[in-house]
């Protein structure tokens, strides 16, 4: 019989539950679970994942170290880790209907921004050029954001970046100006991806522009990958050289990321007729490990494999169809209530509300919504002067659709937001001139002295609690 070299107290420490071992942390976690259960969750980059994904995420798979790739690890004992990673890769390709002869995938990326940096480093040398959608116009930090006076994203310090933008009248990407600028700038990489753009991207036009200037087309589908997997919006894979995505947004998996890359023939030399092959797999995999990361998070890869299996089901497609219906319901109701939407609506999982006609900023509206248990976020919109007090709010449907909300429910959500916008205006108007800054506004709405907020908080919490939350 084996002996136990350490004390009984040590053994108990290793085997105690969280509640028994660390009640302080357990209580904070319970409060967060209660917040989620009693809140209308509208942050477009969030979702509510399944219990099966949680089971895999909080598992002994996190015990194992496995630097390297399946069949080529720097540690022993990885036979089951290899099996999980290979299964995850196969499921990723299946979820997006990809031919493994033409596409490969890296599932070790820790998150979306690192995944994008890993791609850039694989395809470019320092100070090579990249073009991405400007952040205030719906892009993402990791696409090389900088201001006239400061480089914000590290991407813009390693590489030269130049933004493209939307037409401020229509809110749609200005492809003509993008093409003209790309011809002058000659980027090595053209990034097609967004974080707050509600319309479909014309990937075909992007491909033509990339080909015209000899650039790689990188699609960052982090927000919409679940919709793409379900086939309810057009896929970028027909046009892209590389596709990146996070795994925890509309895909409804654990927090992580994937990089998909082309394999096989890239083009044919017009002079010699010789096939020019893609050389992406080796450089991208090397950029992930050992270039930027060490050991992968095996518990995350395990949970991602579970989520990808779910993403290939009819139930997941039905869910994504409802995500789109619910976003369209928000559009219809907000317009009926007299609100302005950036790009005049949505083709995706979110809407972007323009608060300028109401004389408000997103920071104030977000603050009051949070007080009544509605979670969404302030967001920059085209023409904004400040990222701290932008004039938009972003409202997404994935999380509450996962909990079972319908179109009529989201119309009710729009009416709550309309109430809050009107309430914001009256609260701001009542503040004294010497104390009417954002910090004063936030202090007022958090003070418990606004009866409308207290009544709405109770009403929303009771309503939200009727929808299930897998924990």
Swiss-Prot record:
Pathway assigned to this chain's UniProt record: One-carbon metabolism; tetrahydrofolate interconversion
Signal sequence, renumbered to the chain: none
Keywords: Cytoplasm, One-carbon metabolism, Pyridoxal phosphate, Transferase, Virulence
Record-listed N6-(pyridoxal phosphate)lysine modification sites: 249
One Pfam family here: SHMT
GO molecular function: glycine hydroxymethyltransferase activity; pyridoxal phosphate binding
Domain of life per record: Eukaryota
Subcellular location: Cytoplasm, Cytosol
CC annotations in GO: cytoplasm; mitochondrion
EC number: 2.1.2.1
Matching InterPro entries: PyrdxlP-dep_Trfase (IPR015424), PyrdxlP-dep_Trfase_major (IPR015421), PyrdxlP-dep_Trfase_small (IPR015422), Ser_HO-MeTrfase (IPR001085), Ser_HO-MeTrfase-like (IPR049943), Ser_HO-MeTrfase_PLP_BS (IPR019798), SHMT-like_dom (IPR039429)
Biotechnology: As it is possible to design specific inhibitors, shmB is a promising antifungal target for future studies.
Disruption phenotype: Leads to lethality.
Cofactor: pyridoxal 5'-phosphate
Gene3D superfamilies linked: Aspartate Aminotransferase, domain 1, Type I PLP-dependent aspartate aminotransferase-like (Major domain)
GO terms under biological process: glycine biosynthetic process from serine; tetrahydrofolate interconversion; tetrahydrofolate metabolic process
Induction line: Consistently expressed at higher levels in vivo (intrapulmonary growth) than in vitro.
Note from the entry: In eukaryotes there are two forms of the enzymes: a cytosolic one and a mitochondrial one.
Protein's job: Catalyzes the interconversion of serine and glycine. Essential for viability and required for virulence in a murine model of established pulmonary infection.
Entry similarity comment: Belongs to the SHMT family.
Name used for this protein in its record: Serine hydroxymethyltransferase, cytosolic
Organism: Aspergillus fumigatus (strain ATCC MYA-4609 / CBS 101355 / FGSC A1100 / Af293)
Gene: shmB
């Amino acid at each position: 019989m084996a002996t136990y070299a350490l004390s009984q107290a040590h053994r108990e420490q290793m085997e105690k539950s969280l509640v028994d071992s660390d009640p302080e942390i357990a209580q904070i976690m319970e409060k967060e679970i209660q917040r989620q259960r009693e809140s209308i969750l509208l942050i477009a980059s969030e979702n509510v994942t399944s219990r099966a994904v949680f089971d895999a995420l909080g598992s002994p798979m996190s015990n194992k170290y496995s630097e390297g790739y399946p069949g080529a690890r720097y540690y022993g004992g990885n036979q089951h880790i290899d099996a999980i990673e290979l299964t995850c890769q196969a499921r990723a390709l299946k979820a997006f209907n990809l031919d493994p002869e033409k596409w490969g995938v890296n599932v070790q990326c820790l998150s979306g921004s690192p995944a994008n940096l890993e791609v850039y480093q694989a395809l470019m040398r320092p100070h090579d050029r990249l073009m991405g959608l400007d952040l205030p116009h719906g892009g993402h930090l990791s696409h090389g954001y900088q201001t006239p006076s400061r480089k914000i994203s590290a991407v813009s310090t390693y590489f030269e970046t130049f933004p493209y933008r939307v037409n401020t009248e229509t809110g749609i990407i200005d492809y003509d100006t993008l093409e003209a600028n790309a011809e002058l700038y000659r980027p090595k990489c053209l990034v097609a991806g967004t974080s707050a753009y509600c319309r479909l991207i014309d990937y075909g036009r992007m491909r033509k522009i990339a080909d015209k200037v000899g650039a790689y087309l990188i699609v960052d589908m982090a927000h919409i990958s679940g919709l793409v997997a379900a086939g309810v919006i057009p896929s970028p894979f027909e046009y892209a050289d590389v596709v990146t995505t996070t795994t925890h947004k509309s895909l409804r998996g654990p927090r992580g990321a994937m990089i998909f890359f082309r394999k096989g023939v890239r083009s044919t030399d017009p002079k010699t007729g010789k096939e020019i092959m893609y050389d992406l797999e080796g450089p991208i995999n090397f950029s992930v490990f050992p270039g930027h990361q060490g050991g992968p998070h095996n518990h995350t890869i395990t949970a991602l494999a579970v989520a990808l299996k779910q993403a290939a089901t009819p139930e997941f497609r039905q869910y994504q169809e409802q995500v789109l219906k619910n976003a369209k319901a928000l559009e219809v109701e907000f317009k009926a209530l007299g609100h302005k939407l950036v790009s005049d609506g949505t083709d995706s999982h979110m809407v972007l509300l323009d608060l300028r006609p109401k004389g408000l900023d997103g920071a104030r509206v977000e603050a009051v919504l949070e007080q009544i248990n509605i979670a969404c976020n302030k967001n920059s919109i085209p023409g904004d002067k400040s990222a701290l007090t932008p004039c938009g709010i972003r409202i997404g449907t994935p999380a509450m659709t996962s909990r079972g909300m319908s179109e009529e429910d989201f119309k009710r959500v729009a009416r709550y937001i309309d109430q809050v916008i009107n309430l914001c205006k009256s609260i701001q108007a009542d503040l004294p001139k010497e104390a009417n800054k954002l910090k004063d506004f936030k202090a007022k709405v958090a003070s418990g002295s606004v009866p409308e907020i207290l009544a709405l908080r109770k009403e929303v919490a009771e309503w939200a609690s009727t929808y299930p939350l897998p924990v």
